[in-house]
Amino acid sequence: MAATTPLYDTYLRAPLRFERGEGVWLIAEDGTRYLDFAAGVAVNSLGHAHPHLVEALKAQADKVWHLSNLYEIAGQESLARRLTQVTFADRVFFTNSGAEALECAIKTARRYHFAKGHVEKFHVITFEGAFHGRTLATIAAGGQQKYIEGFGPKAPGFYQVPFGDIGAVKNAINEETAAILVEPIQGEGGIRTASKEFMQGLRELCDEFGLLLILDEVQSGVGRTGKLFAHEWAGIKPDIMAVAKGIGGGFPLGACLATEAAAAGMVAGTHGSTYGGNPLAMAVGNAVLDVVLAEGFLDQVREVALVFRQGLASLKDRFPDVIEEIRGDGLMLGIKAKVPSADLLKAIRAEKLLVVPAGENVLRLLPPLITTPAEAREGLARLERAAEAVSGKSGNAAA
């Protein structure tokens, strides 16, 4: 069959084309308005066309776009300093994506042990259901066969244990183990939240056995759970953390953050990125932090998250034949469906609401952090109509 497009057939795209965005709304080419609770898969943290981000990007575009890391870039120094001031980290390496940030995190952990003379320590313990990216290393780290199949031998040095099972983690540690890599909330895996006790247990195991704790906060970070980073809810600090998505507010940007000790092996020439930390990305990243770190912003995220949580709980009670479970924290939420999630997704899209599929028959709600309580209630009303259409039942309006 002749191809109808010159594009790779790697995406199952919805038959929708959007012309522009305004806040939490996307406007299709035919003028139809969609309430966007997908946010580019948790990327558009401040919605679409946020004026402060637009202004920052335009101002930088008039100056210089790209320099490479042959030279100092003022925006990198500024953004890195701000990130280290509000996190555990002392050092930052900028990337263009989450997968690149994870690659840097893995390399940082392995170099840490190499620099100490422990060349045998390069194995990383990861978790079943994880998703860390699409590079050869990160699909091996995720361990899901559907992403590994057909790409040759799995990259060595990764092994998976059940998510949330601290005993299995301890049993997997041996003389070759370098680090533990975990998502505080598994996104692609179905919005599965690690308990505080599990996160604390991982930190304790790393301290006990001399391992590095790597957190993948690509999806859960930058305010999405109501804290700047999700691990803060557990009261722990990692050694290395991968960040992306929301930090760029829609512009390609990622970062690997590390303590001084963890980053000690990453000397000149050990890693690099042609585009990483480019002036345009740095301008937008700094603008995102201007908003997210403003006084009261995360309080507002937590307030609107409560509206969602209460409304979704009501929908679950009213439509038990459609909704099995509500998952997640803050504005990283999941609806585990009893019906096929594809059927519920179709009904939701018919209500001009955008959400994101995930594993375990789950649909993700990842609204922009600027979503208001009124917009949250509008989205819940659309979810109610979708659930009603799938269930065939009627009832009172959702909260």
Curated annotation (Swiss-Prot):
Intrachain S-S bonds: none
Compartments where found: Cytoplasm
Keyword Cytoplasm: yes
Binding positions (pyridoxal 5'-phosphate): G98, A99, F131, D216, E217, V218, Q219, T274
InterPro entries in alphabetical order: AcOrn/SuccOrn_fam, Aminotrans_3, Aminotrans_3_PPA_site, Class-III_PLP-dep_AT, PyrdxlP-dep_Trfase, PyrdxlP-dep_Trfase_major, PyrdxlP-dep_Trfase_small
Keyword Amino-acid biosynthesis in annotation: yes
Main location class: cytoplasm
Reaction equations catalysed: N(2)-acetyl-L-ornithine + 2-oxoglutarate = N-acetyl-L-glutamate 5-semialdehyde + L-glutamate
PTM-bearing positions, type N6-(pyridoxal phosphate)lysine: K245
A Pfam family that the UniProt record links to this protein: Aminotran_3
Cofactor(s) demanded: pyridoxal 5'-phosphate
Entry keyword set: Amino-acid biosynthesis, Aminotransferase, Arginine biosynthesis, Cytoplasm, Pyridoxal phosphate, Transferase
Catalytic EC class: transferase
Record-level GO cellular component terms: cytoplasm
Listed SUPFAM superfamilies: PLP-dependent transferases
GO molecular function: identical protein binding; N2-acetyl-L-ornithine:2-oxoglutarate 5-aminotransferase activity; pyridoxal phosphate binding
Catalytic activity, EC: 2.6.1.11
Family: Belongs to the class-III pyridoxal-phosphate-dependent aminotransferase family. ArgD subfamily.
Note from the entry: May also have succinyldiaminopimelate aminotransferase activity, thus carrying out the corresponding step in lysine biosynthesis.
Entry-linked PANTHER family: AMINOTRANSFERASE CLASS III, SUCCINYLORNITHINE TRANSAMINASE
Oligomeric and partner information: Homodimer.
Name of the protein: Acetylornithine aminotransferase
